[in-house]
């Protein structure tokens, strides 16, 4: 691994970011955590975003959990994706929190989802549960932008889900809605409620929701990348 100081300055361009990600390929999470002097959790149950934060640290990300992209200056979002030994994604991928109020006039073109997914650096990480967290290896990175077909599928799903939110049907949306994009509750506990619109236009309190990419989008994308 190149011996740049940690944490490095934010990358100046896409090429530098990709080079940094390539340099991490093949290392275990334990090796990277030890070098960064990070404590390795026993598992990810209580610290779901730990892998992403560790890689952000090495890559020089600046946004944290703000709504902008992780590498806002160069317009790139970082997404780690746990994969099986066959290179298939093991879970859905969080994109961003869904706005449940104040959505009049919002369009796909101006949406957070589209902004976050415009350019993504995907970093696959071994994710099978029998592999201890410290022994899981980082895979080869992939820079991706949605192609015409993927963008159309994302737009269609987003518009359908946003229509349901605006019409006060947020509580009837299930993870089965959407071909490649789903909406589901995102909260560590069921007491963290947020305001939304009810069926009759009245304010209601409900669990915060997040947009997630389904494996129907990420599996073919990884298969093309790794020629599976």
Curated annotation (Swiss-Prot):
Belongs to the MutH family. It is found in: Cytoplasm. NCBIfam families: mutH_TIGR, PRK05070.1. GO terms for molecular function: DNA binding; endonuclease activity. InterPro entries: DNA_mismatch_repair_MutH, DNA_rep_MutH/RE_typeII_Sau3AI, DNA_rep_MutH/T2_RE_sf, Restrct_endonuc-II-like. GO terms for cellular component: cytoplasm. The gene is mutH. This is DNA mismatch repair protein MutH. Keywords: Cytoplasm, DNA damage, DNA repair, Endonuclease, Hydrolase, Nuclease. Sequence-specific endonuclease that cleaves unmethylated GATC sequences. It is involved in DNA mismatch repair. Its main location: cytoplasm. Coiled coil: none annotated. The keyword Nuclease applies. The keyword DNA damage applies. One of its GO terms (biological process) is DNA modification. It comes from Yersinia pestis.
């Amino acid at each position: 691994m190149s011996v740049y100081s940690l944490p490095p300055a934010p990358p100046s361009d896409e090429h530098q970011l990709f080079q940094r990600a390539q340099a991490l390929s093949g290392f275990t999470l334990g090796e990277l955590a030890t070098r960064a002097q990070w404590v390795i959790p026993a598992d990810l149950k209580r610290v779901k975003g730990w892998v992403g934060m560790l890689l952000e640290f090495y890559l020089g990300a600046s946004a944290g959990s703000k709504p902008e992209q992780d590498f806002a200056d160069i317009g790139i979002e970082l997404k780690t994706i746990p994969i099986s030994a066959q290179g298939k994604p093991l879970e859905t991928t969080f994109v961003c929190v869904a706005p449940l109020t104040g959505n009049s006039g919002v369009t796909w073109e101006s949406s957070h989802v589209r902004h976050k997914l415009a350019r993504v650096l995907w970093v696959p990480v071994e994710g099978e549960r029998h592999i201890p967290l410290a022994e899981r290896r980082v895979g080869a990175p992939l820079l991706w932008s949605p192609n015409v077909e993927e963008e159309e599928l994302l737009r269609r799903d987003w518009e359908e889900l946003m229509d349901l939110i605006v019409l006060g049907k947020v509580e009837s949306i299930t993870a089965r809605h959407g071909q490649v994009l789903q909406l589901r509750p995102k909260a560590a506990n069921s007491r963290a409620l947020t305001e939304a619109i009810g069926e009759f236009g009245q304010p209601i309190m409900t669990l915060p929701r997040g947009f997630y990419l389904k494996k129907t989008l990420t599996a073919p994308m990884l298969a093309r990348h790794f020629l599976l």
